[in-house]
Regions:
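Short loop/turn segments that connect beta-strands within beta-propeller blades
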Residues: 73-75, 124-128, 165-169, 204-208, ...
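Repeated scaffold domains used in trafficking and secretory/extracellular systems
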Residues: 46-51, 86-94, 136-144, 178-185, ...
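A short beta-strand motif characteristic of beta-propeller blades
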Residues: 36-42, 78-83, 129-134, 170-175, ...
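Conserved small/polar residues in nucleotide/adenosyl-binding loops
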Residues: 248-255
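Beta-strand-rich domains and repeat architectures in extracellular enzymes and scaffolds
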Residues: 38-67, 88
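Residue position within the beta-strands of beta-propeller blades
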Residues: 59-60, 99-100, 149-151, 190-191, ...
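N-terminal Sec-pathway targeting helices
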Residues: 1-15
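Short, solvent-exposed loop/turn segments at conserved positions within beta-propeller repeat blades
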Residues: 63-66, 107-117, 154-159, 194-197, ...
Length: 256
């Protein structure tokens, strides 16, 4: 009888351990996105990425609580804090939230708008299971597919263009130029070249190739649904819309 009870207890303990191991493996397994997934709009990210709407929820940096990470319904009801990180450059997709920490201090709040932030992080949609993808000074971040593209700081290169996979296992330098990844569309990142002629450039995330989309003196380029929008520095800072289907015709660009 005692032997049977002992065997039963051992069996139950074994089953419990198996369940715990299974749950641990399942909770640590990364949920991946499709190749064209994005985490936020260029307009939001170019303005600090302080909020992001996803699946009828708004994830935001609460200005009344030191820019800590909050979520609320899309009708602005039921706001609640997700964690105590002061955040910016918020991206949300699939099972995760991605953001840059601000290490908030009253005297450094302006760093959000100067792009001087500290570390790229991933957490679950409930704000838990925090994972550092990069833990030093960084700039704007954006999700494309299963990689976070971001401006990376180092002692040798003040800001460079990097990507890190959402599991945080592989970090790759793409360029020594600090391109902004804010505008992601169909697996391509578009940006105004911060050096040289300020052309609109495109970076193919599948081939890792950068090319000139349009020869112009641009700033804050944004590409959406067949059109590129940018500020033309040579036309008194006019807002210009470019039909990307007519790039090589005289009717391509219109001032707005």
């Amino acid at each position: 009888m005692k032997k049977a009870i002992t065997i039963s207890v051992i069996t139950i303990i074994g089953l419990l351990l198996a369940v715990l191991i299974f749950l641990s493996i399942r909770s640590s397994r990364i949920v991946y996105n499709n190749d064209n997934a994005i985490g936020n709009s260029a307009g939001n990210l170019n303005n600090g990425g302080l909020f992001c709407e996803y699946n009828d929820k708004i994830y935001f940096a609460n200005p009344y609580d030191y820019n800590k990470l909050y979520v609320m319904n899309s009708d602005c009801t039921n706001a609640m804090k997700l964690n105590d990180d002061s955040v910016a450059s918020i991206n949300v997709c699939g099972s995760y939230i991605y953001y840059v920490k601000n290490n908030f201090k009253q005297e450094t709040i302006g760093t959000i708008f100067r792009g001087q932030l500290f570390g790229v992080y991933r957490c679950n949609l409930n704000g838990e299971s925090l994972k550092a993808l990069y833990d030093s000074l960084s700039g704007t971040i954006a999700l494309s597919g299963n990689s976070i593209y971001y401006q990376h700081y180092s002692d040798t290169t003040p800001l460079a263009f990097h990507k890190v996979d959402i599991a945080g296992k592989k970090d790759t330098k793409i360029s020594d130029t600090p391109y902004s990844p804010a505008c992601v569309h169909n697996g391509t990142i578009y940006f105004s070249d911060p050096v040289g002629k300020h052309n609109i450039l495109s970076y193919d995330t599948k081939t890792d190739k950068t090319s000139v989309l349009y020869d112009c003196n641009s700033y804050l380029a944004d590409v959406e649904n067949g059109y590129a929008y940018y500020i033309d520095l040579s036309k008194n800072y006019s807002l210009v819309r470019l039909n990307t289907c007519l790039l090589y015709t005289s009717d391509a660009a219109d001032e707005l």
